[in-house]
Amino acid sequence: MNVMIKKISLITICIAVLAFAVFAAVETMTFSKTLKKEIDSKLFYETKKIANQMSMVFENAEGSVDTLCAEIEHNFDVHRQLQSPEYINSYMADYSPVIRDALADIEDSQGLYLTFSPDITDRNGAYEIWYSYDRNGELTYTDATSNGIYYESFEDESFPTMHYYFGAIANPGEGIWTEPYMDSDIGQEVIAYSRAVYSDGILIGVAGTDIYTEHTVRLINDMNTEHDGMIFLLNENNDLIIASDNAKRTDILDSTPLWRSVTKNTNGRD
């Protein structure tokens, strides 16, 4: 009888252990799924928050330039300019403070300008209104001829600093973003958003804003990510424009297969 009791007890213990193991496995799986769901949710939230932060920077730049273009189209008399080439001088004097004050109100933009088309000027001067922040953070009027080149650059569409101009002209009615390039007039690498301004089908010029690359990198590095997460700014082809410093310290940017894996199903921003 004692042997039978021992056998029953042993069987009972085995069943209890097995039941506990099954229960523990189910609980572990449930906890893992819950934990994964929480992690995925937090990662999605963090990613969306960072994307929204960067979107605000670019949308502010786009909105400011688009508004500026609408104002110029409305208040610049292109027909008067074609009849009296000196009209542009008085216009620049009157409108220069407007561009200066507009730049002061655009958060995270470091330059704002209106480049007039040479085709409506007498080419006797640099017809451009350009304000930018210098390295000391001072808002200053910027000389577009400081690198010794002005009208020559309008003859070469491949000139690095002129993509903002020719790219905008090639896309009438919409704004364009450039890839990062070195602007020799101010000694800064920038990305630019620009848009061509027309009146009665006549090109007045191109308005645009600059965001210094180092400023964008600083914005990206200042964004808090979980577990030292990496941030990338891509164009519509998933080509890298700017990356956070911790991403540059890895081999992710040099590994084509890894980069394709990272950018798979990702919509870049131009």
Language-model regions, residue ranges each:
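Juxtamembrane extracytoplasmic/periplasmic/luminal helical "stalk" adjacent to the first N-terminal
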Residues: 6-12, 19-93, 101-104, 108, ...
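Amphipathic alpha-helical regulatory segments at dimerization interfaces
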Residues: 97-106, 167, 218-223, 265
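Extracellular/periplasmic ligand-sensing ectodomains of membrane signal-transduction proteins
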Residues: 102-174, 180-187, 239-260
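Short loop/turn microsegments at loop-to-beta-strand junctions
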Residues: 128, 192-193, 228-230
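PAS and PAS-like sensory modules
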Residues: 175-180, 266-270
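Conserved beta-strands of PAS-like sensory domains
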Residues: 186-224, 236, 242
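Intrinsic low-complexity, intrinsically disordered coil/linker regions enriched in small/polar
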Residues: 214-270
